[in-house]
């Protein structure tokens, strides 16, 4: 893990921040950059989002993370995290200063919801969004698969051949 040592709660969309992110991306040369969504609830997260987009430029595609409770977020990629949900919850609980129990419950609700969007009523999924920007139009080979889709069939009521009187 790399820490840039910017103050918590005071991060801004500054040129200095974007420059430091760019330096790290040039050094690490990632295949994919996963960052907070531009509409995330937390100001620091929005600053990371803006900085990541500038820093990634033509170096790596950016995959936006579903913000808490998915407000105004239209995902186009889903990843089955069912085998890792317990680990995710343990990681969230490590953030003791943030009142983590609330965030664990929110993670469960959101994970079930995103899994259900894939037709899986059991399990957990995380949702992401990639906005294709040249030269990174297709990133499917860079991410794990979504939960398997379960087809749903809805039967319409049978229509009566003879018209009903009015």
Model-derived regions, located:
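The feature marks non-catalytic terminal segments
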Residues: 59, 67-166
């Amino acid at each position: 893990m790399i820490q840039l040592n910017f103050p918590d709660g005071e991060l801004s969309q500054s040129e200095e921040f974007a420059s430091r992110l760019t330096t790290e991306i040039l050094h690490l040369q990632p295949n994919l950059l996963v960052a907070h969504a531009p509409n995330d609830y937390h100001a620091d997260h929005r600053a990371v989002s803006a900085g990541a987009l500038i820093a990634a430029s033509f170096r790596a595609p950016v995959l936006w993370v579903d913000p808490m409770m998915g407000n105004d977020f239209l995902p186009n990629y889903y990843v089955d995290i069912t085998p890792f949900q317990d680990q995710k919850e343990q990681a969230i609980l490590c953030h003791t200063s943030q009142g983590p129990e609330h965030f664990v419950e929110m993670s469960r609700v959101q994970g079930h919801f995103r899994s259900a969007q894939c037709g899986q009523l059991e399990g957990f999924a995380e949702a992401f969004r990639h906005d294709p920007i040249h030269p990174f139009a297709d990133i499917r080979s860079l991410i794990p698969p979504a939960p398997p889709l379960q087809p749903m069939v809805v039967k319409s009521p049978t229509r009566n051949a003879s018209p009903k009187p009015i």
